[in-house]
Amino acid sequence: GEECDCGSPSNPCCDAATCKLRPGAQCADGLCCDQCRFKKKRTICRIARGDFPDDRCTGQSADCPRWNGL
């Protein structure tokens, strides 16, 4: 299956021909992806809203998880 979006041949993290991450890349896009690497754990990826605290990267994924109250 696809590891990344093949739509843009200019993405330095994704091989547009195969839809696979390029060698050494952890991710191609996402709020917790920076220059083909996962952002460090606890990096803020979404600013606090109302009573909810900031959402932070896990260091293991390009996705920005919603705060779960734990």
Curated annotation (Swiss-Prot):
Key words of the record: Cell adhesion impairing toxin, Disulfide bond, Hemostasis impairing toxin, Platelet aggregation inhibiting toxin, Secreted, Toxin
Task: Kindly indicate whether the keyword Disulfide bond belongs to this entry.
Answer: yes
Q: Where is this motif: Cell attachment site?
A: 49-51
Spell out the disulfide connections: 4-19, 6-14, 13-36, 27-33, 32-57, 45-64
Q: Pfam families from the xrefs?
A: Disintegrin
For molecular function, the Gene Ontology terms on record are: toxin activity
At the top level, the lineage of the source is Eukaryota
Give the Disintegrin domain ranges.
1-70
Q: What Gene3D superfamilies does the record point to?
A: Disintegrin domain
Please list which residues make up the signal peptide: none
Tell me the compartments it is located in.
Secreted
The record's tissue-specificity note reads: Expressed by the venom gland.
Q: What is its main location?
A: secreted
Q: What does this protein do?
A: Inhibits fibrinogen interaction with platelets. Acts by binding to alpha-IIb/beta-3 (ITGA2B/ITGB3) on the platelet surface and inhibits aggregation induced by ADP, thrombin, platelet-activating factor and collagen.
Subunit record text: Monomer.
Extra remark beyond the main annotation: The disintegrin belongs to the medium disintegrin subfamily.
Q: Which family does it belong to?
A: Belongs to the venom metalloproteinase (M12B) family. P-II subfamily. P-IIa sub-subfamily.
- Name this polypeptide is given: Disintegrin triflavin
